[in-house]
Amino acid sequence: MQEILIPLKEKSYKVFLGELPKIELKQKALIISDSIVAGLHLSYLLKRLKALEVRVCVIESGEKYKNFHSLERILNNAFEMQLNRHSLMIALGGGVISDMVGFASSIYFRGIGFINIPTTLLAQVDASVGGKTGINTPYGKNLIGSFYQPKAVYMDLVFLKTLEKREFQAGVAEIIKMAVCFDKNLVETLETKDLKDCLEEVIFQSVNIKAQVVMQDEKEQNIRAGLNYGHTFGHAIEKETDYERFLHGEAIAIGMRMANDLALSLGMLTLKEYERIENLLKKFDLIFHYKITDIQKFYERLFLDKKSENKTIKFILPKGIGAFEIVSHIPKETILKVLEKWH
């Protein structure tokens, strides 16, 4: 079992990578999962969990269910089983479940503890660590939420064996995101090695990158913004396609390519570096066809990004391999020229 300590000012916790251990709790626990994950992995968790009382809340699977209705269902279950401030919520699932349960636990009784047990690659390397929680709204993705850290995160690679290839590759997109912005050595690992042979090592490296970033910038004031590479465009794509056509990681892969187009036009990437990222995405089947139907509408949607302020879009753009820059005040014509390529 490998461990990563994330020491923060208000709350420190550990990320455990290895076989899920026995979890013994002296308080009540509400497990929240989705309809697919519960069928695959709930019994595995229940065999390892001992608590004063256990209840299970199952939410429909999918990004479009990351909403107020699902949040209300979670909270109603918490009230019905009379959870108190010492009780726990347990998130068993991917990024959607992790985000919703984190948010629910942050607002129930003004905050109770929760444990993350991520079951997808994307959730293991990204969503379950760092304390970003939230739900989607008709106006955009993750626009309502909070920063709220878990009590612990347990990552068991056995969960990944049931992932479809598409789900797995979506998680790789988030690994590439972190590698391009923070660690050129990880980029080289992804380029030269078979991921099957070094999966645990790559997950550990990815979580460690995110842990270091979160330790420096828990509330996303500066360096943590690098974790949003590809997300300004990616979130707009998800909203434009009603969260149904692409998985989150797939939309981020497209968003990274759009960001790369912008970085290339601004001279932040050389053509060689641009092609290197493109080839890495190709290696993991992360090149998708996407066509913007209404460029002006898509452009306006970019302003709904949480990083935007004073009617200015902030873009996270790669600056070579292994570094990034937050760029704002880019002329509208420059952005529209990039979007034209996708029209």
UniProtKB/Swiss-Prot annotation:
Annotated positions binding NAD(+): 61-66, 95-99, 119-120, 132, 141, 159-162
Cofactor or coenzyme needed: Co(2+); Zn(2+); NAD(+)
GO CC terms of this entry: cytoplasm
GO biological process: amino acid biosynthetic process; aromatic amino acid family biosynthetic process; chorismate biosynthetic process
Pathways involved: Metabolic intermediate biosynthesis; chorismate biosynthesis; chorismate from D-erythrose 4-phosphate and phosphoenolpyruvate: step 2/7
GO molecular function: 3-dehydroquinate synthase activity; metal ion binding; nucleotide binding
Chief localisation class: cytoplasm
Annotated cofactor note: Binds 1 divalent metal cation per subunit. Can use either Co(2+) or Zn(2+).
Binding site for Zn(2+): E174, H231, H248
EC number: 4.2.3.4
Catalytic reaction(s) noted: 7-phospho-2-dehydro-3-deoxy-D-arabino-heptonate = 3-dehydroquinate + phosphate
Annotated localization: Cytoplasm
NAD as UniProt keyword: yes
Keyword Nucleotide-binding in record: yes
Pfam families: DHQ_synthase, DHQS_C
UniProt keywords, alphabetically: Amino-acid biosynthesis, Aromatic amino acid biosynthesis, Cobalt, Cytoplasm, Lyase, Metal-binding, NAD, Nucleotide-binding, Zinc
Stated role: Catalyzes the conversion of 3-deoxy-D-arabino-heptulosonate 7-phosphate (DAHP) to dehydroquinate (DHQ).
NCBIfam families: aroB
Family: Belongs to the sugar phosphate cyclases superfamily. Dehydroquinate synthase family.
Protein name: 3-dehydroquinate synthase
Species assigned in the record: Helicobacter pylori (strain HPAG1)
Gene this protein is translated from: aroB
